[in-house]
Amino acid sequence: MINQTAMLLTRSLRPRSAFVGAGLGYPRRFLTTVESPLHEFFVVIFNKRNAKESDLAPAPQTIKFKEQDVILTFAGDMMASAAPATDSAPERTLGACFRVPGTQRAESVAGDSRPREHRQGAVGY
């Protein structure tokens, strides 16, 4: 189920007409919001260098990756932690650890080039 969600999420990471933050001073092309088709997580990905400071919301939990201008923000029943990605992971790979609602286990989503049946999930942009 996690693999299927990750693949669908990857396919849905394309520009949309209605972006979170539109009208708050964020350049629309640098802000993307994606909700998983199975509704177990929600992410916002944006380019930090092009986002203006805003006092409208409290600081979210974030995960910082190799590319320091990218932030992954969780909302809802989430647990943000460092991804289990290694130095050999492809550049511009996002990784995250999140709690699946209704369970006590944490699931990982990280860049992985292994065959689908051997990986935890791959999310890229």
UniProtKB/Swiss-Prot annotation:
Provenance organism: Emericella nidulans (strain FGSC A4 / ATCC 38163 / CBS 112.46 / NRRL 194 / M139) (Aspergillus nidulans)
Region (Disordered): 104-125
Induction: Expression is positively regulated by the aspercryptin cluser-specific transcription factor atnN.
Transmembrane annotation, as ranges: none
Composition-biased stretches (Basic and acidic residues): 113-125
Domain of life: Eukaryota
Disruption phenotype: Decreases the production of aspercryptin by more than 80% but increases the titer of aspercryptin with Ile replaced by Val more than six-fold.
Gene of this entry: atnK
Pathway: Secondary metabolite biosynthesis
Protein name: Aspercryptin biosynthesis cluster protein K
Function: Part of the gene cluster that mediates the biosynthesis of aspercryptins, linear lipopeptides built from six amino acids including 2 highly unusual and nonproteogenic amino acids, 2-amino-octanoic acid (2aoa) and 2-amino-dodecanol (2adol). The core structure of aspercryptins is as follows: Ser/Ala-Thr-Ile/Val-2aoa-Asn-2adol. The first step of aspercryptin biosynthesis is the generation of the fatty acid precursors, octanoic and dodecanoic acids, by the FAS subunits atnF and atnM. The fatty acid precursors are likely transformed into the corresponding alpha-amino fatty acids in three steps.
